[in-house]
Regions:
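P-type ATPase nucleotide-binding
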Residues: 339-465, 474, 486-502
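Transmembrane helix-loop-helix hairpins at the membrane interface
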Residues: 2-123, 234, 241, 270
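Conserved ATP-binding TGD loop and adjacent catalytic N/P-domain core of P-type ATPases
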Residues: 401, 427, 433-577, 585
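Soluble-to-membrane junctions at the N-terminal ends of transmembrane alpha-helices
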Residues: 1-14, 45-75, 215-249, 321, ...
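Juxtamembrane coupling segments of multi-pass membrane pumps/enzymes
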Residues: 65, 90-150, 181, 306-309, ...
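Conserved cytosolic catalytic loops of P-type ATPases
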Residues: 115-208, 313-356, 398
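Membrane-water interface of transmembrane alpha-helices in multipass transporters/channels
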Residues: 29-37, 60-68, 81-91, 231, ...
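Conserved catalytic phosphorylation-site environment of P-type ATPases
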Residues: 63-70, 172, 273, 283-359, ...
Length: 627
């Protein structure tokens, strides 16, 4: 508990003790009134103060106003009729207990999320004259060498230049299994170094590092509100004035009706009491507090599992997802290409690889990198001229003055060359040198071990259709789709074709159904932003993914997609439970209050009791590990 909460708790205890003592003091009249005002002011002075401020600022209709009017009115009725002030003070007392509980619950949720996302480093170690000096991470320039000792957080993204260790990435990915890291490996901020001392050359400033982007994303998620939250805000705006005027009508109209049409006693005290009970019941705290708390807890629970959601609106959209579209490379497959062989070549294997690697040297595409890796020597780019990249086909260039073409069968057709056709599964890179076909290079990409299980999990979660888009050949695409159990596959697509295909798929679905696109974030930004919900996978260290997507999965496990959908559905289920429960109970109690069956004690349950139950239910959204 913080200082403010402890102060409220002390006031609750003092007021409760004073009420018990006063119960046994047999005094009447004005002295009884003055004595009971002591516990009332102890417990309610801040509510009265806020209500007065609201009236002064012309922001009248809120829960403080409702409680102030209800309790002051109840005291006035008690003073006029029987001198029993217990109910009025009990209303304020239990309201404060409910508020304290809500404050504690929200604080606890925030603390849980802060602990789960406790990845912000406090300092970075820099070696000066053989001694380690702690500096603020913001002060470390790009290219500096920092030292991370066992047990410390990696403060800034970089590359390991000395040492090896195991890293705990659980705060980022939700996975407890440690990862090995060695010299030459890229390392991201937010990981915890578990064993050896590491020297890291920074590649980013702290503000641009992974840890800063993640924290910024999580902290700003509450600004993007869901339809449910916006509905509750609008509902409260009109609901509170409506119940205030209804209570006023309940206090005045029935007595007037009795006087004018029944020639009976007006029973002002009885009807004012009913109106005050009506006001206490009508307080919208349960909805106003529990709905945002449900989303807040849901986003926190998701972040614990390595699923970062940029706002509750995206969580709501994800819960309605019925179609999932995947990019193949890096999403369903490892995205780590390796040369599996060189075929139908007349030149030496090494020579074919040399020409291919040099021709592709200006590209950062994974296939280009795999060719450079297979070549195994340092690339001398001065040997390469006249590079031309032909979208959807491949590359032409001159290597040592020799014309080289490397690409798919479309490129060979464009150049008017006959080529070898093959049924081998993998990416085929055909090579032509000085206008003569020189064979093809087979490049393979492994399917991720959990991809098939991920598709099954999605279908079990009620996903109607799984679709894969790829620029790869039809043979490769069909083979991967068949192995994984994917419903539809579209192959040989250019980057622009993927957007058009997603547009086509969006037009096919129902109006209330949502379509999610899952990519690795490297070149999928247009498609991620076009889908109803964009999900970037394996985003550790990928700025593009964190910027472009609505939801970011921090590791490469496709099983997390189904988990993210289950988390969103649990969160929305809790939101609906709280909405229906709170509105249902309040409507019943409002009717009972209006006809005189409900008293102040039932009103207290309808307000404070419902709020406590709704808040407890909302906190369940934090616990999603077993989904």
């Amino acid at each position: 508990m913080n200082k403010k909460q402890k102060k409220v708790l002390a006031r609750i205890i003092i007021a409760a003790v004073l009420m018990i003592i006063l119960h046994f003091i047999p005094v009447k009249g004005i002295i009884r009134f003055l004595l009971y005002m002591v516990p009332y002011l102890v417990i309610g002075y801040d509510i009265l103060k806020k209500a007065f401020k609201g009236i002064k600022n012309k922001q009248v209709f809120d829960e403080n106003f409702l409680m102030a009017v209800a309790t002051v009115g109840a005291i006035a009725v008690a003073l006029y009729e029987n001198g029993d002030y217990t109910e009025a003070i009990a209303v304020m007392l239990f309201y404060q207990i409910g508020e304290l509980f809500q404050s504690y619950a929200v604080g606890k949720s925030r603390k849980n999320i802060s602990e789960l996302m406790d990845i912000r480093p406090d300092y970075a170690n820099i070696e000066v004259d053989g001694k380690l000096t702690q500096v603020d991470p913001d002060e470390v320039a790009i290219g500096s060498v920092i030292v991370v000792q066992p047990g410390e957080k990696v403060p800034i993204d970089g590359v390991i230049v000395e040492g090896s260790s195991t890293l705990n990435t659980s705060a980022l990915t939700g996975e407890s299994a440690p990862r090995d890291a060695k010299c030459g490996d890229e390392i991201i901020s937010g990981c915890i170094n578990m064993s050896g001392v590491l020297k890291i050359k920074t590649t980013k400033e702290f503000g641009e590092s992974t840890v800063s982007k993640i924290l910024d994303l999580v902290e700003n998620s509450s600004s993007k509100k869901s339809k449910s939250e916006n509905f509750i805000s609008k509902f409260a705006k009109y609901y509170t004035p409506a119940v205030c005027y209804s209570a006023l009508a309940l206090a005045i109209l029935p007595p007037l009706f009795r006087i004018l049409f029944m020639s009976a006693e007006p029973q002002w005290g009885s009807w004012i009491y009913r109106a005050l009970t009506f006001l206490v019941i009508s307080c919208p705290c349960a909805l106003v507090i529990s709905i945002p708390l449900s989303f807040f807890a849901g986003i926190g629970g998701a972040s614990r599992e390595g699923v970062l959601v940029k706002g509750s609106n995206y969580l709501e959209t994800l819960s309605q997802t019925r179609y999932v579209v995947f990019d193949k490379t890096g999403t369903m497959t490892e995205g780590v290409f390796e040369v599996a062989g060189v075929y139908d070549n007349t030149l030496d294997r090494e020579k074919v690889l040399e020409y291919a690697a040099l021709a592709e040297s200006s590209s950062s595409h994974p296939i280009s990198r795999s060719l450079q890796k297979a070549y195994g020597k340092e690339i001398d780019r001065t040997r390469v001229t006249d590079i031309e990249e032909i979208s959807g086909h491949g590359i032409t260039a001159k290597v040592d003055g020799v014309s080289v073409a490397a690409g798919n069968y479309k490129l060979m057709k464009k150049l008017g060359l006959s080529y070898s056709e093959t049924d081998k599964v993998g990416t085929i890179v055909h090579i032509a040198i000085d206008g003569s076909y020189e064979g093809y290079i087979l490049i393979s990409d492994k399917i991720k071990p959990t991809s098939a299980a991920a598709i099954k999990a999605l279908k079990k979660a009620g996903i109607k259709g799984t679709i894969m888009l790829t620029g790869d050949s039809r043979t490769v695409a069909d083979s991967v789709a068949a192995e994984l159990g994917i419903d539809e596959v579209y192959s040989e697509l250019l980057p622009g074709d993927k957007v058009a295909k997603v547009e086509e798929l969006l037009a096919r679905k129902g109006s209330k159904e949502k379509l999610a696109f899952v990519g690795d974030g490297i070149n999928d930004a247009p498609v991620l932003s076009r889908a109803d919900i964009g999900i970037a996978m394996g985003a550790m260290g990928s700025d593009a993914a964190i910027e472009a997507a609505d939801i970011v999965l921090m590791d490469d496990d496709p099983l997390k997609i189904a988990k993210a959908i289950k988390i969103s559905r649990k969160c929305l289920r809790i939101v609906y439970e709280n909405t229906y429960f709170a509105i249902g109970i309040k409507l019943i109690c409002l009717v009972l209050g209006a006809v005189g069956i409900a008293n102040m004690w039932l009103a207290i349950f309808a307000d404070v009791g419902v709020m406590v139950i709704a808040v407890l239910n909302a906190i369940r959204a934090l616990f999603v590990h077993k989904l």
